[in-house]
Amino acid sequence: MSILAYNGGCVVAMRGKDCVAIATDHRFGIQAQTISTDFKKVFHIGPRMFLGLTGLQTDILTVRDRLMFRKNLYETRENREMCPKPFSAMMSSFLYEHRFGPYFIEPVVAGLDPKTMEPFICNMDLIGCPNAPDDFVVAGTCAEQLYGMCETLWKPDLEPDQLFEVIAQSIVNAFDRDAMSGWGATVYIIEKDKITERTLKTRMD
């Protein structure tokens, strides 16, 4: 078994029309054993920016803390809010610094640019190779199932309500086909004037 799949979990982010969505499951386990059903994998790190991390639980918490430290240092030095693109570049550089002893995580960044309100999504591998497409990004143990669902349901210029429906159906149907993730999901819809958080109740097995 890959160390990335040891604790299970999944994250998916999608672009819409002037909005972006990010969703995650709730499971934290050790291989097939479920330890808790409320482990947080998506973190609110800016007014319109979220970071999702899947992989090894200890590395998720370590990387979250170290990236928050670097982000706060940047904002103190520059005296301005950090945008999703520079944050992704900083995270890519941080992960590549540790390429010979990497953190076993797959990060996903989703947010809106503070000036242009342009939606931005990005994911990386464990040594920080970035991928910023125009549609969706996935990470975690049910990535293959998520790719299939997202490719089927996603289309350009989805409104916030439509985007919620698409991302919710995608993640629920994907982790229902994966024993290492699931136990409910949380979806965040980021718009220029508000952030909506919704919790999905699903099969608890």
Swiss-Prot record:
Coiled coil: none annotated. It comes from the Eukaryota. GO terms for cellular component: cytosol; nucleoplasm; nucleus; proteasome complex; proteasome core complex; proteasome core complex, beta-subunit complex. Signal peptide: none annotated. Its main location: cytoplasm. SUPFAM superfamilies: N-terminal nucleophile aminohydrolases (Ntn hydrolases). It is found in: Cytoplasm; Nucleus. Keywords: Cytoplasm, Nucleus, Proteasome. GO terms for biological process: proteasome-mediated ubiquitin-dependent protein catabolic process. Disulfide bonds: none annotated. Non-catalytic component of the proteasome, a multicatalytic proteinase complex which is characterized by its ability to cleave peptides with Arg, Phe, Tyr, Leu, and Glu adjacent to the leaving group at neutral or slightly basic pH. The proteasome has an ATP-dependent proteolytic activity. Belongs to the peptidase T1B family. The 26S proteasome consists of a 20S proteasome core and two 19S regulatory subunits. The 20S proteasome core is composed of 28 subunits that are arranged in four stacked rings, resulting in a barrel-shaped structure. The two end rings are each formed by seven alpha subunits, and the two central rings are each formed by seven beta subunits. The catalytic chamber with the active sites is on the inside of the barrel. This is Proteasome subunit beta type-3. The gene is Prosbeta3.
